[in-house]
Design a protein with these regions (language model features):
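Iron-sulfur-associated redox domains of electron-transfer enzymes in respiratory
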Residues: 1-157
Length: 157
């Protein structure tokens, strides 16, 4: 690793549920907790509404890693959205491995509105994991090989 590589910081996109994870991130900011600033947050109504194509598009457009975070099981504002997200994520993760994307580049977690310290800890961990993988080089450019599988993942429960 040369000096330029040690200065490299990963670009991470975080899709956060409005009701829990985004509120946890907000509380972390208000509490002035320290965590890496290279995460770009996208607030979504529910983790269950995150289409797998959003994750792939983020990777295609230069993100080195993606974090999806929602409410804890049983606490979803929309009753079962986080369960749908967990099912989709499990399938998507296997598809990404199939096309050669390292599993650590895309991560899923639960964070409640009161868990500011947990949010900061997760951001530090995701950043360290993605940094250890290095810059994303091989990403999906042509979805034709997995388009059928991705459309199956997008089916609503």
């Amino acid at each position: 690793m040369n000096e330029a590589d040690t200065d490299w910081e990963p670009k991470i996109v975080a899709f956060l549920c409005n009701w829990c994870s985004y509120a946890g991130a907000d509380l972390a900011g208000i509490s002035r907790l320290q965590y890496p600033t290279n995460v770009r947050v996208i607030r979504v109504p529910c983790s269950g509404r995150i289409d797998p194509f959003f994750i792939i598009k983020a990777l295609q457009r230069g993100a080195d890693g993606v974090l999806v975070s929602g409410c804890h099981p049983g606490d979803c504002h929309y009753i079962s959205g986080n369960y749908a997200a967990r099912r989709r994520f499990a399938i998507l993760k296997r598809l990404l491995e199939y096309v050669g994307i390292e599993p650590g580049r895309v991560q899923f977690t639960w964070v409640s509105a009161a868990e500011a310290e947990r949010f900061a800890k997760i951001i530090r961990k995701v950043t360290a994991d993605v940094k250890a993988l290095g810059p994303a080089k091989r990403l999906v450019k042509d979805f034709s090989a997995i388009s059928h599988q991705l459309s199956a993942v997008s089916i609503q429960p």
